[in-house]
A protein has these predicted regions:
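Well-ordered beta-sheet/strand-loop patches within structured domains
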Residues: 1-29, 91, 98, 118-119, ...
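Cationic-aromatic interfacial patches
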Residues: 1-122
Length: 510
C-alpha cells in the first residue's frame, strides 16, 4: 500500500473510531472486524441502498423519522469528500441501522418509563447479532426479517395509510352539532351524521336528509365497532364517538402499532387475550377466537388500574376462598372494624399462624394501617368476592381472572369497577373450555368439584399463555378497524412520548 493509500486508510479508521467511541457496541464491532465497512465501501452499494430504502418507510410504521433520517444520510453520503468524512458517515449509518432494527423489533419507547402499569419485558436483540446479520446476510432479506409479522400489525399499518389518505381528502366532514339524535329526526345535524357515516364507510352515498332505517343500520354498525350499546340510536356517547376526528383515530392506530412492536414475540398457537379497553377476554387458537366473554377490569384510579403484562395460566381454583389484599384490609376494612368490630362479618380475621381470631379478642382501635398484624380471608360461599372459580397465572401483581357474585356490572358499556383483577361474565364456560383440552368430561368434572363446596385446585396439564393488553384500535375478525375509549388515559401518554420522540401525523399541521 502506498503512502497516500495508507494515510487515507488511517484517516478513515481514525475518524470511524473517534465517531464510534461513544457507543461501545459499535466501537467493538469495528475493532473486531478490523474496521471493515458495512455501508460506505464500493462493495457495499446493495446493503447501503437496502437500508436507505427501508428507513425511508419509517413514517409508514409510525416511527420517529428523525431517528434514522434517510434523507440526511443520503446527503451525508453524497457530500463526503474525505476519508474522514466517510468514517463519520459509516458510523452514522450503523447507528441508524441499529436504531431502526431495535425500534422495529421491540418498539421505539421503553414502556415502563412511560407508565408503570405497562409491564412488558422488552427483549431487544443485541447489536452484535444485528450487525452480524446485516454483514453476512442478503441485505433485503435481513431487513425484511426485522419487520413485525403479526397479522394485526399488518392490518394496523394498512389502516394507518388509509386514515392518512382520508385526512388528505378532507377528513370525515363537519362535526355533528347535536347532543343526541334518534330515528325519525331531520335537520342539519342528521345531514352531518349522514355525511360522516358515508365518509367512514358505514353508509352508501345518499341524499336522504332524515334518520331512516339505512342510517339506523349504519349507526348500529358504528356502535358495534366502537364498543357502544348497539341500539341504532345516536345517543350522547355515540355522537361523541362519531365526532372523534380521523387525526385522533390515527394517533390510536400509531400507538397500537407501537404496542404490537413491544409484543414482537411468539404468542403461542393457543392463548388467552384480555384487551382491557374492550372489556373482553378471548381464547385464541390458531388465530381464531374459540371462546369470548365480557369482563370487568380495574377502576380508573391509582393502584387499581389493571396492568398490562403476559404470564402463563397454571391452574384454576373451584370454590375459592378470598385472601383479602393488604391494601383493601387497611384502606377499607380496618376503618370499618374500628367503628364496629362486627362489620364485614363474612370476612375472617387471621393471625400470623393461620388461625381464625375471634373479633372480640381484638382491639382494632389500637392499630394503624401500618401496625395491623392480621390478614383477612373470606371462606368459599355463594357470596364470595371471587365467586365460584378463579383462574390463576401467578404473578407479582397478584392479578387473576375470577367469577363474581356482582353480575349486573357486565351489562354496562364501560366496565372498570374492580380493584385490578379481571372479573369474568361466563366463568363456568371458561372453565369448561380450559378443562376440555385435558378431559372428555369437562363439564361433569367441574360440576362434581363445585358441588362439594370445598376449595379445589385443578392444575392445567398444559400451561396457557395469558396476555393482558391495551389496544384502543385493532382490527376485528374481518379486518375492519374497531376503536375503544382510552379508559386509563394510557394511549394519550404514549402518544405524547412518541410525539416527543419525533413521530408525526402525516399531512396534519400543528
Amino acid at each position: 500500500m502506498g503512502s497516500m493509500a495508507k494515510s487515507e486508510a488511517t484517516a478513515f479508521t481514525q475518524s470511524l473510531a473517534a465517531t464510534a467511541a461513544s457507543d461501545a457496541a459499535i466501537a467493538e464491532w469495528y475493532r473486531t472486524t478490523n474496521y471493515e465497512t458495512l455501508w460506505t465501501g464500493p462493495e457495499d452499494a446493495a446493503r447501503r441502498a437496502a437500508l436507505l430504502a427501508a428507513i425511508a418507510t419509517a413514517g409508514d410504521h409510525g416511527l420517529p423519522v428523525p431517528r434514522y433520517d434517510a434523507t440526511a444520510l443520503t446527503v451525508a453520503l453524497q457530500s463526503a469528500e474525505t476519508e474522514g468524512d466517510r468514517g463519520r458517515v459509516e458510523v452514522e449509518m450503523t447507528r441508524a441501522y441499529l436504531a431502526w432494527a431495535q425500534d422495529l423489533t421491540a418498539g421505539a419507547l421503553e414502556p415502563q418509563k412511560i407508565d408503570a402499569g405497562i409491564v412488558r419485558e422488552i427483549n431487544r436483540i443485541e447489536p452484535k447479532v444485528l450487525l452480524a446479520r446485516i454483514a453476512n446476510g442478503e441485505p433485503e432479506a435481513v431487513l425484511a426479517w426485522l419487520l413485525p409479522k403479526s397479522l394485526q400489525y399488518v392490518q394496523l399499518m394498512k389502516a394507518k395509510l388509509g386514515i392518512e389518505a382520508q385526512i388528505a381528502a378532507g377528513g370525515w366532514g363537519s362535526a355533528i352539532q347535536a347532543v343526541a339524535l334518534k330515528p325519525g329526526d331531520t335537520g342539519p345535524a342528521v345531514i352531518a351524521l349522514r355525511d360522516r357515516l358515508v365518509r367512514m364507510g358505514y353508509l352508501a352515498p345518499s341524499a336522504v336528509a332524515s334518520y331512516d332505517r339505512a342510517m339506523q343500520a349504519a349507526v348500529t354498525a358504528f356502535q358495534l365497532n366502537h364498543g357502544l350499546t348497539a341500539d341504532g340510536a345516536a345517543g350522547e356517547g355515540t355522537v361523541a364517538e362519531l365526532n372523534v376526528g380521523p387525526e385522533e383515530r390515527l394517533k390510536s392506530v400509531i400507538v397500537a402499532m407501537e404496542r404490537e412492536r413491544w409484543m414482537h414475540f411468539d404468542r403461542e398457537v393457543k392463548h388467552v387475550w384480555v384487551n382491557l379497553p374492550d372489556f373482553r377476554a378471548k381464547i385464541i387458537e390458531d388465530g381464531k377466537t374459540v371462546f369470548e366473554t365480557r369482563v370487568v377490569i380495574g377502576k380508573n384510579v391509582p393502584d387499581q388500574r389493571s396492568p398490562e403484562f403476559s404470564d402463563e395460566m397454571e391452574h384454576m381454583v373451584i370454590n375459592p376462598s378470598w385472601g383479602v389484599p393488604r391494601s383493601i384490609i387497611v384502606k377499607e376494612y380496618l376503618p370499618l372494624l374500628q367503628r364496629n368490630p362486627n362489620a364485614v362479618s363474612h370476612i375472617q380475621v387471621i393471625d400470623g399462624r393461620g388461625r381464625v381470631v375471634p373479633r372480640g379478642s381484638v382491639n382494632f382501635g389500637a392499630y394503624s394501617a401500618r401496625s395491623f398484624p392480621f390478614s383477612m380471608r373470606q371462606p368459599p360461599s355463594d357470596g364470595n368476592a371471587l365467586g365460584k372459580v378463579k383462574f390463576m397465572f401467578p404473578n407479582v401483581h397478584n392479578i387473576y381472572l375470577h367469577d363474581t357474585p356482582s353480575k349486573s356490572l357486565f351489562d354496562k358499556e364501560v366496565r372498570a369497577y374492580s380493584h385490578g383483577c379481571i372479573r369474568v361474565a361466563d366463568p363456568f364456560a371458561l372453565a369448561h373450555e380450559l378443562l376440555s383440552w385435558q378431559t372428555d368430561n369437562a363439564e361433569a368434572e367441574f360440576e362434581a368439584a363445585l358441588k362439594t363446596g370445598k376449595e379445589t385446585t385443578v392444575k392445567l396439564k398444559q400451561h396457557l399463555p395469558v396476555h393482558l393488553v391495551y389496544f384502543t384500535a385493532y382490527p376485528d375478525a374481518k379486518g375492519r378497524m374497531t376503536y375503544r375509549r382510552d379508559v386509563y388515559g394510557r394511549d394519550a401518554v404514549l402518544w405524547g412520548a412518541l410525539s416527543e420522540a419525533g413521530v408525526e401525523l402525516a399531512g396534519v399541521q400543528g
